[in-house]
Amino acid sequence: MSYPDDYSTDIEKNKMDLKEFKEKTQIAELESKVLRLELKNKDVTRENVQIKKENEILKRELDKLRIPPLILGTILDKVNERKAVVKSSTGPNFLVNLSQFVDPEDIVPGARVCLNQQTLAIVEVLPKEKDYRAMAMEIEEKPDISFEDIGGLNNQIRDIKEVVELPLKNPELFEKVGIVPPKGVLLYGPPGTGKTLLAKAVAYETNASFVRVVGSELVKKFIGEGAKLVRDVFKLAKEKSPCIIFIDEIDAVASKRTESLTGGDREVQRTLMQLLAEMDGFDSRGDVKIIAATNRPDILDPAILRPGRFDRIIEISMPDEDGRLEILKIHTEKMNLKNVDLREVAKLAENMVGADLKAVCTEAGMFAIREEREFIKMDDFKEAISKITGKKEKCSYDMPQLTVMYG
């Protein structure tokens, strides 16, 4: 059977088109496959680079772990630029060489160094040792109490500003007059009169660093620990200068020295002598101010009270009627009062200190809450004064000592 020529030509053309279409399809599939492989290759390359980086980090960490530990030592004497006498932590003294990576200027007696285990050569100089207990005494966040929050102590605030705040903010005034600024102030008075509050206000008002120490923290069990802590506190203060050191309850460490032979008393006396030396010893104290507080000035050692250590001794006495009124205004500023005469409250609150007046305000608020009121009236304050006065009378067996001490 024969086909027309035109029909045969169409068949051949269709075959050619089909073949060409298959080839194009195969090429497109191959190009798509190549593109996918290229993308996959990029991902693999990226992962390979990341794995190599991690491998290098792990190798470095492994090398660090393989390095043998170094021996700690203390420089006793520098012989020349490349040799020094070292006391190792294992006990004996050695004459050792300096590594080429160590600056000879850093090799001074007392410096802490690292020694190679095999050759005992000095390979590194460590920073000065710091007592973590002294570091913890620095206050990072300053209190939010200013002098405006303290009532009835205007003269005392003026005195403490002249001794502590003025030398730090305007030292040129003392240079013009030609005098050395005072360096210390002792606050004494009955409990609750605002001694610690004044120190908090000083920390708030000045931009100086503030180190707070409680006297009992300086009394340690073993010989030399208390004196070392005192040295470290003053060393920290010098590094952070201008700085204020506040020693609360200083009578715990600065009581009068006696002939007592007990080990505990001797250690307290050693700590006191170190404190005296740091306050006004051979080395200059620099721009470091000291504020101390106590409610037992009668038992303090006379040596610590002399000028040069505490240039100004400020009595924080019981507030008078006007002082009590100022304190009440501060504590009742945010309270919802109704028909309350604060002057009358101040008259009724005779022989009360600032802490007592704050307790009175709190108790008055509690009486209002007890009666489901949103405001405080005069009767609440009267009941609160009676309650606080009753508590103080129950503890009257402690009062004769305070009466004798503060007149």
Swiss-Prot record:
Residues 405-407 are annotated as: Docks into pockets in the proteasome alpha-ring to cause gate opening. The keyword Coiled coil applies. ATP binds at G192, T193, G194, K195, T196, L197, H331. Residues 22-67 form a coiled coil. Keywords: ATP-binding, Chaperone, Coiled coil, Cytoplasm, Nucleotide-binding, Proteasome. One of its GO terms (biological process) is protein unfolding. InterPro entries: 26S_Proteasome_ATPase, AAA+_ATPase, AAA_lid_3, ATPase_AAA_core, ATPase_AAA_CS, NA-bd_OB-fold, Nucleotidase_PAN, P-loop_NTPase. SUPFAM superfamilies: P-loop containing nucleoside triphosphate hydrolases. CDD domains: RecA-like_PAN_like. One of its GO terms (molecular function) is ATP hydrolysis activity. Pfam families: AAA, AAA_lid_3, Prot_ATP_ID_OB_C. It is found in: Cytoplasm. One of its GO terms (cellular component) is cytoplasm. Belongs to the AAA ATPase family. ATPase which is responsible for recognizing, binding, unfolding and translocation of substrate proteins into the archaeal 20S proteasome core particle. Is essential for opening the gate of the 20S proteasome via an interaction with its C-terminus, thereby allowing substrate entry and access to the site of proteolysis. Thus, the C-termini of the proteasomal ATPase function like a 'key in a lock' to induce gate opening and therefore regulate proteolysis. Consists of three main regions, an N-terminal coiled-coil domain that may assist in substrate recognition, an interdomain involved in PAN hexamerization, and a C-terminal ATPase domain of the AAA type. PANTHER family: 26S PROTEASOME REGULATORY SUBUNIT. Homohexamer. The hexameric complex has a two-ring architecture resembling a top hat that caps the 20S proteasome core at one or both ends. Upon ATP-binding, the C-terminus of PAN interacts with the alpha-rings of the proteasome core by binding to the intersubunit pockets. This is Proteasome-activating nucleotidase.
